[in-house]
A protein has these predicted regions:
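Classical eukaryotic N-terminal signal peptides for Sec-dependent ER targeting/secretion
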Residues: 1-14
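Residue-level detector of alpha-helical hydrophobic segments embedded in or interacting with membranes
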Residues: 7, 20-23, 350
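N-terminal processing/targeting junctions
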Residues: 11, 18-20, 301
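N-terminal signal peptide
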Residues: 15-29
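Metal-dependent phosphoester/phosphodiester hydrolase catalytic core
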Residues: 26-436, 448-450, 458-496
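An anionic, turn-rich surface loop/hairpin at beta-sheet edges
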Residues: 440-448
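C-terminal structured "cap/appendage" subdomains that terminate the fold
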Residues: 443, 453-455
Length: 496
């Protein structure tokens, strides 16, 4: 980042040479036109539909059904909210009592909307094999972001070439949309806080920040409006920029857009379907302690998935008050609430129902090229090991990495053959204006590291004992690395 900050020091000189030019998308003539659509798993047999409009809606509604010609059901809400500096309103409707694993068609009620479709969530315990994708650190492309012609040998430099409006990761997700069932994105969306890296934005940072958010979520909507898109925070959601946060206007700090956009769509925690009374009690406790979209969990078929917040709400959190990142955000819960949630949630997982236990968060503590989060490791790693998390997915470092299962900086001697330690991956190479990160010094327990091109991870649940991780090159779809984790899952409840 040193070169990036050196560039920032020159901004006052550049400011006298440019005109303000925030690149807002055009506002549709029909202000009820839905934009920035996003879906999420909201609960058992429950799906949330989120979208934005350029005016407040008195009653956001969605029509839906199992045939595109017969949208016989309708759900409505009163959730149409905005914040200072935003041009749009966020709307959310939840569809409940859906038949599991079923294709539904839906239409957001507007005089200018179309019929789309989604696949409803699998019930916990469904043993049908399926795949999901992990996409992290993905930013806007085009005039305010990166382009596929960027010279990836130049790390942390400002791209100055003309854009090619082609986002290779989103294109690959679109081309393979029938090959996966949902996406997890643990942090760093859009990179709106990097608005100052384009000189045209220097005199109009407030509008440039909002324009980038509108651009990015419009670019993402062909995917997020079709597949459940499960979000948790990263450092680039915190404020309007990471250098002098105190200059950010109201509405552009303390994760405001992230909370407004995703807060009502994400789940809390699912009620336990275990026969064990303790599991039900712990799941109910987790449900009360959850704070979506910052920390929460959901179940889908063979997997129990937990999203954590590596930015705030634990000791020495980097983005918290007085934290090392200087973003002074949060807290969003009571003291220790996130860790109490995590312990309650992990202890509720019945492996006879959901054999696979996965974690998603933003900042990794195992990484080959620097950027590891020591305070995150101190807060979270003991719980991940204690309750037998199988796979932990992180980003923040802009490349792809896979590690042998590891605990307390020591590789598990069993490798991928029934380890007790979690397997860790970094899937931060989806593409953003800051470029890719060098692989760096190779740790002894690293098994794959790639920073030559944009990429993401595909996780396939083959059965109750075998999980496959593939790293995909976004531009071509080729598999860069593949591995299969075997877990015996002998214990109904893991405590070690």
């Amino acid at each position: 980042m040193a070169k990036l900050f050196a560039s920032v020091k020159r901004l006052p000189v550049l400011a006298g040479c440019v005109l303000a030019a925030a690149s807002y998308p055009p506002i549709p003539a029909d202000l009820t036109t839905p934009v920035q659509q996003r879906l999420a798993i909201n609960g058992p047999n429950s799906f949330s539909i989120g979208w934005n409009t350029y005016q407040k809606l008195d009653q956001p509604c969605v029509q839906y059904g199992t045939s595109s010609d017969e949208l016989t059901q309708q759900a409505c809400s009163s959730a149409s909210v905005t914040y200072a500096t935003s041009r749009t309103y966020s709307n959310v409707v939840t569809l409940a009592d859906l038949s599991p694993a079923t294709t539904y068609y839906y239409k957001i009620v507007s005089t200018n909307s179309s019929v789309e479709h989604f696949f409803s969530p699998r019930v916990a315990g469904d043993t049908t094999p399926f795949s999901m994708n992990a996409v992290i650190d993905m930013g806007v492309y085009g005039v305010d972001g990166y382009t596929i012609q960027m010279d990836e040998a130049k790390r942390d430099t400002i791209p100055t070439i003309d854009p090619s409006l082609n986002h290779t990761t989103i294109n690959q997700l679109a081309n393979t949309v029938d090959d996966y069932e949902f996406i997890v994105h643990p942090g760093d969306f859009a990179y709106a806080d990097d608005w100052y890296l384009k000189t045209k934005n220097i005199l109009d940072g407030e509008d440039a920040f909002q324009a980038i958010l509108e651009q990015f979520y419009a670019q993402l909507s062909p995917i997020s409006g079709r597949k459940a898109y499960m979000a948790s925070p990263g450092n680039h959601e915190a404020a309007c920029q990471e250098i002098i946060v105190g200059l950010c206007p109201t509405g552009q700090k303390n994760f405001t857009d992230f909370m407004t956009r995703f807060g009502e769509t994400m789940s809390t925690a699912f009620p336990s379907t275990s026969a064990a009374e303790a599991a039900k009690i712990n799941a109910n406790k987790a449900q009360l302690l959850a704070k979506p979209p910052f920390w929460y969990s959901f179940e889908y078929g063979m997997v129990h998935f937990v999203m954590i917040n590596t930015e705030t709400d634990f000791d020495n959190a980097p983005d918290g008050q007085g934290g090392s990142a200087g973003l002074n955000s949060g807290p969003f819960g009571a003291p220790d609430q996130q860790l109490e949630f995590l312990e309650a949630d992990l202890s509720s997982v019945d492996r006879t129902v959901t054999p696979w236990l996965l974690i998603g968060g933003h900042r990794p503590w195992y990484t080959t090229g620097g950027g590891g989060c020591d305070s995150c490791q101190a807060a979270f790693e003991p719980l991940l090991y204690k309750y037998g998390v199988d796979l932990a997915i992180f980003g923040h470092v802009h490349n792809s990495q896979r590690f042998q299962p590891v605990f307390n900086n020591t590789a598990d001697p069993n490798g991928l053959d029934d380890p007790t330690a979690p397997m860790y991956i970094v899937a931060g190479g989806a593409g953003n204006i800051e470029g890719l990160s060098d692989v760096g010094s190779n740790l002894t327990y690293n098994r794959f590291a790639y920073a030559d091109d944009f990429s993401y991870a595909k996780i396939s649940f083959l059965d109750a004992n075998n999980l496959q991780v593939d790293f995909i090159r976004s531009a071509t779809g080729e598999v860069l690395d593949t591995s299969v984790l075997y877990k015996s899952h002998k214990a109904q409840f893991v405590v070690q």
